[in-house]
Amino acid sequence: MKAGNKTKTKKIGQVFTPQYIVEEILNYAGYTSTTIIDKHIIDNSCGDGAFLKVIVSRYCQESINSGTPINKIKKGLEKYIHGIDNDPVAFNQCVENLNEIACSYGITNIKWDLYNQSSLSMKQFDGKMDFVVGNPPYVRVHNLDSTYEEVKQYSFANGGMTDLFLAFFELGFNMLNSTGKLCYITPSSWINSVAALNMRKYILREKNLVSLTDLGHFQAFDNATTYTLISLFSKNHKSNEFDFYVFDGQKHERAFIDRITVNECYIDSYFYLSDKAHLKWLNDIKTKKSAKYVSVKNGFATLADDVFIGSDIPESNITIKTLKASTGKWYNCLFPYDKKGKLLPPEIALSDPAVKTHFESHKEDILKGKPDYPCYYEYGRTQALLDVWKDKIAINTLLRTEKDLKIERVKAGQGIYSGLYIINNVEIPFEDIVNVLVSPDFAYYVSLLKKYKSGGYYTFNTKDVEQYINYVLTFKTDKNYDDKPSISDKDLRLF
């Protein structure tokens, strides 16, 4: 990534690739030895030439090793190596870099087959490439400018809050010939994002996935925090099986984990990556119809926590104690709602002078540019309001091991924010639920979800916790709870 240019990175997704990653990707793809001679290869988002520099160097060296004369090597560079990038500064630097490398082999005045334009509108390479490699741009759809309409023409990128790199996967697949290989490093989010569903369905249908290498928490790029995956596909690969690896960031090499099938890792419309045994376990948790012993929900979403919650909030008729689940700390909270979750009218909510003064002094922070109205003191969202008057169990949403969990009982009349909470649907001792969560098994389960966060942490959502607790209580305990819910009697929409 270009230093000091975060806005540009956000808009066009430039994150330049370190050489050791380039070398690994080319090795995974099989762009090695003299077999690369007279093989078409393209980087369709080449930037300043991180991939093309190594490609040119390998092509020259292997051609020399095979006894190819310089004039023929020059023609090969012009004919078989291709690149595209729409950033003129990076593009010009790429040309300079390639000229410098070629010159070191005694080759000059090359007419490179490089294009300074948008890859998404180019069709002349479709069906012609032996290799498509690269590090495509990562740009969320709401940051796209003129390329938005081009992106939406790609089926991989027309669902949900999409990302530009999904379109580049489809673009790359289109470029491959009948035996071509594609190898990209991209965010790992395509395995579990709603936006990438069409791509996952394509992989299930085509069975062209050769290997996935998960970099996990390892950060391959300078000045850019992203959790990445190296994906290798081949048009010549027609198998349900693929190899799964994890990348060792210290050794800069990958370690084989297991050969698994696409069907084994495709669970509830998402891809999960692990060995066969743990994928079977995860599949059971995610798909077996457990009894609904508990419900798990998100805490308050005031959208102005500093106004409603804090140690300086005045005591009043609408003040309750509220737990910040992410830290385990308690604060006062202004809760202008009745026991049915309905907003209190101004004459009640603002009856305490200290509360009225507090709200009025922070009115702009609550309204956030919206027009003023009498009940301006309401929360941004209504979630968790009704459950204030129930006993709950609070849980944070970040962990590395089970020791990072913060689990606390929250009594009826108290609130929760910045985390999740668990409600019993039948009488279950607090300790039983805690024991389910503080086990190493739960922490490992969360790690399998691969929702990476900085610092080596993983995160999880309400559905993840609810499925796990209900699965364990249904299938992995001998205890019988009163009023045990019957799966057959429950509304199956809950599952």
Predicted regions and their residues:
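Short, solvent-exposed loop/turn segments at the edges of secondary structure
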Residues: 76, 224-228, 415-417
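Class I S-adenosyl-L-methionine
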Residues: 1-76, 82-101, 121-123, 136, ...
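Conserved acidic residues
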Residues: 39, 79, 130, 210, ...
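Short, ligand-facing micro-motifs at secondary-structure edges
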Residues: 214, 399-414, 444-455
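C-terminal substrate-recognition regions of SAM-dependent nucleic acid methyltransferases
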Residues: 8, 229-394, 436, 444-445, ...
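A short beta-sheet element
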Residues: 402-435
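Signature of N6-adenine DNA methyltransferases within the class I
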Residues: 10-11, 15-24, 45-53, 60, ...
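Conserved SAM-binding strand-loop segment of SAM-dependent methyltransferases
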Residues: 107-119
